[in-house]
Structure formats: C-alpha cells, structure tokens
C-alpha cells in the first residue's frame, strides 16, 4: 500500500514537473517569437532609413563625405544599381526564410496537449527538395549574369580620343598624379574635367604602386581598384557634375593607411583649362623669399622633393612646385595653412604619426624663411 502511494506520488510530481516544463517552453517560444519579430522590425527600419537617406541625397550639393549611395559617374552608377539589385533579391530571400522560420516555430511549438504523443514524422518530399535545389541555382545564375554584365561594361569600356589620361602612383602614405600628355605632376588632389554626356570626356587612370599594396577608391566616382607593385591596373570615371569628391586608400598599407586620403576636384571645362594653365607655369625667383629657397636647396628637403627651377629633384615625397594650389597637406591629413605647414616641417608626427617624413631640425628663422618661400608656390 505504501509502495503504491509512493508510486502515485511520484507520478503526480512527474506530471507537475512536465506541465511546468511545458509552460516554460511555451514562455521561451513566445520570447523567441517576440525577439524575432523585433529583430525583423529593426532590420526593416534600418533598411528603410538607409534607402530613404539615399533617395533624399542632394545631388547638386558639394560632397563632404565618402558616399556609396550617391553615384556621380557611369561606373559608380552601374555598381550601385547592381548592388541594389542584389540587395533586393537577398532581401526577398531573407523575408521569405524568416517568415517560414517564424511560422514553423509558432505553428509547431510544443503544447500541453501534445504530451506523450509522438509528432507526425515526415520522410521527405520530392517537390520541396526540387524547389530548394532549383530555385537557389536559378538565383545564383541570375546574380552571376548581372554581375558579369556590369564587370564587362566597366572593364572593357573603349577609350575615346577625348579621354584624359592620368597616371596614379601610390606611395606610403600619399598619392602622386601625373598627367603625361599635359606635362603636369601633382599630389593628393586630382583635378579632372566634368564629362558631358553629349561630348564625353572621361578620365582613364593607370594605377601603379611605388612600394606596397594600395587601393584607389572614390565611392561616388567608381569602385575601388588596387595598386600593386610591378603590376599595372586601370580604371575610368566620367563625373556627371562638378564638385569635390573624397576618397581614400582602401587597402591596408601601413601605419598611416587611415590618413592616406585623396580629393578629386571635378572642374567645369573652363576651370579645368585654367588649372592646367596655372600648373604649367614655371616658378619665379622672388628676392623677398630668396632666403627660404636657399634653405630648401641646402637641407635634406631636396633629397625627397622637387620644385621646378631649383636643385630639388627628389621623388620620394610629393612635388612641391605648386604646393599652395592645394587645399591640404600630408595627403589630406591637415589643411594647407601657415600654421599647419610650420608644424608639418617641425614635427610631421604631430599631424601624421608614423609618417616617413623626418622632422627637420631647423632654426626658427629658417622655418620662417622656408614657409614664406613655400607660400609663393602657387
């Protein structure tokens, strides 16, 4: 009798324990459902805001940030449209899979009435297995064809006779721009003309590296393209409006990779012609700053830098012939002002830690004279 009571008591406890676990399971499933719903809402909200931001981007305003949502050239627009196409397909896949997952979790969750009953066993479905094989294959084929089409259109574009040719050389940690047909060499700030669709004047870039791997990337004007030692890569862009576009090195290249910035100034035809004319002007001797020129020619400056009309013919650092025509120094790390220029000469690491430019051990009078001289190089 006592044994039967003990067994009955154990059976009651087990039933109570099982009911408790089922309730806990139901609560857990509700939490999962709520969490999944919240996550889906957050993702949808983020995507909506991202697309709304892209749609609301003001195309006529000067660019101030690197922006992948406001393409301003044919290659960039092709890449953007492909990205949105892939995003739409993957978004649909995400919604379908998430919906089915949530439905299955909610519909077939464990209930108190299911206790002790084995769920229905399914041993395969030819239709479902064909569907989840054929549909993914078709999706991959569509994505492959769309991507191949864009790659072909960008990489195999013909070069018209009106195209501007620029050689881009990546250095640690600055950019060199050479215009072979114009006889111009500058640094960090690329000037190119706007391309009128009626009379296209695209810019074709030949990309080289002087030391290690770099990557040229101006998001609004084109995809990133690597600069690799002993290899020539090419890319092109045809900006549709004038303005300032920011870019940067997109391949880790050393300590100051993050500050290897670049600026692309897209000029109207007349403005670009004026810039070319000013860059072709030789430097002139100015008696008021002859002392600064002497400092440049008698110190280590000439080992790295070139200034037309002086003994300086170095190529390790940027060409300074028209230094003051640039808005920034140190590859965009600082504005090109008197104060920043003095600091850059005295202690480059204060502006760009890890820079390969050494601190010039100059007296204050020599720094003053050198800065006054450099400020005449326009």
Regions found by a protein language model. Name each.
Residues 57-85, 105-315, 330-346, 351-353, ...:
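Non-transmembrane, membrane-proximal soluble domains of secreted or membrane proteins
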Residues 41-52, 94, 135-141, 145:
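Hydrophobic alpha-helical membrane-insertion segments
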Residues 78-98:
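Hydrophobic single transmembrane helices highlighted by the model
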Residues 30-43, 82-87, 129-134:
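Alpha-helical transmembrane segments and their helix-start/interface "positive-inside/aromatic belt" motifs
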Residues 377-378:
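Short, solvent-exposed mixed-charge patches
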Residues 6, 10, 14-17, 24, ...:
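N-terminal secretory/membrane targeting signals
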Residues 94-110:
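Alpha-helical transmembrane segments
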């Amino acid at each position: 009798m006592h044994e039967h009571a003990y067994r009955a008591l154990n059976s009651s406890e087990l039933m109570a324990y099982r009911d408790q676990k089922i309730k806990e399971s139901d609560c857990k499933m509700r939490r999962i459902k709520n969490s999944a719903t919240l996550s889906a809402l957050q993702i949808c909200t983020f995507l909506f805001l991202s697309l709304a931001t892209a749609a609301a981007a003001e195309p006529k305003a000067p660019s101030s940030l690197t922006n992948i949502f406001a393409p301003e050239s044919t290659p960039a627009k092709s890449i953007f449209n492909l990205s949105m196409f892939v995003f739409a397909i993957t978004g649909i896949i995400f919604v379908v899979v998430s919906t089915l997952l949530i439905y299955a979790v909610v519909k077939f969750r464990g209930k108190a009435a299911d206790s002790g009953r084995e769920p229905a066993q399914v041993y395969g479905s030819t239709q479902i297995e064909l569907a989840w094989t054929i549909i993914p294959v078709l999706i991959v084929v569509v994505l492959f064809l769309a991507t191949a089409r864009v790659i072909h259109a960008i990489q195999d574009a013909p070069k018209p006779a009106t195209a501007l040719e620029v050689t881009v050389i990546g250095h640690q940690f600055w950019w060199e721009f050479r215009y072979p047909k114009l006889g111009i060499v500058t640094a960090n700030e690329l000037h190119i003309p706007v391309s009128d669709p009626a009379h296209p004047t695209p810019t074709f870039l030949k990309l080289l590296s002087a030391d290690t791997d770099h990557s040229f990337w101006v998001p609004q004007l084109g995809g990133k393209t690597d600069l690799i030692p002993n290899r020539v890569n090419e890319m092109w862009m045809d900006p549709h409006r004038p303005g300032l576009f920011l870019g940067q090195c997109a391949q880790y290249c050393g300590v100051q990779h993050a500050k290897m910035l670049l600026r692309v100034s897209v000029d109207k035809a007349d403005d670009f012609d004026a810039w070319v004319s000013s860059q072709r002007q030789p430097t002139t001797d100015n008696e008021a700053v002859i002392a600064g020129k002497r400092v440049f020619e008698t110190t280590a400056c000439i080992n790295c830098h070139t200034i037309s009309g002086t003994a300086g013919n170095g190529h390790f650092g940027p060409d300074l012939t028209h230094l003051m025509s640039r808005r920034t120094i140190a590859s965009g790390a600082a504005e090109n002002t008197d104060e920043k220029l003095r600091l850059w000469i005295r202690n480059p690491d204060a502006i760009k830690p890890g820079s390969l430019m050494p601190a010039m051990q100059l007296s204050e009078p020599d720094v003053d004279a050198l800065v006054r001289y450099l400020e005449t190089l326009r």
